[in-house]
Every structure is written in structure tokens, then in C-alpha cells.
């Protein structure tokens, strides 16, 4: 059976992740639109997931979703370079469409991970 190579670039889009996060910073209402679509684990870049998680925490605590509060929520996870990249990214209008795309890429990554685990699981010895 031939092994097919998977183009990992189709499984994430860092620009799209940054655009979603930038849109939330510019308008916290965008977070309400995608709150039920995305989780922090859907972001390919762990730092983006951490920022998203901090945004959700701010929303849940009725705090403004802005850099000062995000920095406090992130604590030692705060990365100024990552935050500057997010802030420097243009916001998007249809944040829900982009969130669905990120979710789809996350699901595909999970499927690839499972597919890679199957051969080793199949070849494991079962206890008698």
C-alpha cells in the first residue's frame, strides 16, 4: 500500500488565525459570534490559542478584550512579538466564516494525527 504525503500547509493558516484574533481585539462582539465555534485548541500556533483563551476569560469576567487585560490574563505566556503580529494584522468582516475554516483545519489535523496512530495501534500485541 502506497503512503501518500500530506501537505501540512493545508492544515493551518497562521494569517487567518491572526486575522480572527485581531478582529476580536478591534471588536469584542466578534468573540460572541465565534465563541461556540472555536476552542483554544483549534489554533495551530499554541500562542494563538493562549491569546484566544485569554480573550474568552476576559469576556467571561466582563473585562474589555484589549491588550492590557490580555497581558494580565496571559501572565508568563504573554509574548510581545505574537501580540504585535496580531495587532498589526488587518481585521476581517466575516469572522464567523474564518472561524469555521480554522475549525475545519483543526479537525483535519486531528484526523491526520489519528491516521498516523492507527498502524501502531493495529500492530500492538493484545494480552491473551
Question: What name fits each language-model region?
Answer:
Residues 1-107:
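Noncatalytic partner-interaction/assembly domains of nucleic-acid and motor enzyme complexes
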Residues 113-128:
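Non-catalytic interaction/clamp surfaces of large macromolecular machines
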Amino acid at each position: 500500500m502506497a503512503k501518500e504525503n500530506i501537505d501540512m500547509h493545508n492544515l493551518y493558516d497562521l494569517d487567518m488565525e491572526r486575522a480572527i484574533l485581531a478582529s476580536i481585539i478591534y471588536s469584542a462582539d466578534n468573540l460572541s459570534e465565534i465563541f461556540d465555534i472555536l476552542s483554544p485548541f483549534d489554533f495551530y500556533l499554541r500562542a494563538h490559542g493562549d491569546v484566544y483563551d485569554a480573550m474568552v476569560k476576559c469576556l467571561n469576567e466582563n473585562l474589555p478584550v484589549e491588550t492590557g487585560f490580555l497581558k494580565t490574563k496571559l501572565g508568563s505566556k504573554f509574548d510581545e512579538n505574537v501580540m504585535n503580529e496580531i495587532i498589526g494584522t488587518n481585521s476581517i468582516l466575516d469572522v464567523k466564516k474564518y472561524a469555521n475554516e480554522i475549525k475545519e483545519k483543526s479537525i483535519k489535523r486531528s484526523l491526520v494525527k489519528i491516521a498516523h496512530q492507527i498502524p501502531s495501534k493495529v500492530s500492538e500485541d493484545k494480552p491473551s
